[in-house]
Amino acid sequence: MEIATLVAIFISGLLVSFTGYALYTAFGQPSQQLRDPFEEHGD
């Protein structure tokens, strides 16, 4: 394989991994610890 193909696959893998981690943090188990600024405002 050419070096450009390997670099493209590596960058794509990083992007998919980061997106998966962001979704897990936003909607998975760690999301229970996130604060909600709209709940704190309380009008």
Swiss-Prot record:
The keyword Chloroplast applies. The chain crosses the membrane at residues 3-23. Its main location: plastid. One of its GO terms (cellular component) is chloroplast thylakoid membrane. It is a single-pass membrane protein. GO terms for biological process: photosynthesis. It comes from the Eukaryota. Keywords: Chloroplast, Membrane, Plastid, Thylakoid, Transmembrane, Transmembrane helix. The keyword Transferase does not apply. It is found in: Plastid, Chloroplast thylakoid membrane. Belongs to the PsbN family. May play a role in photosystem I and II biogenesis. This is Protein PsbN. The lineage of its organism: Eukaryota, Viridiplantae, Streptophyta, Embryophyta, Tracheophyta. The gene is psbN.
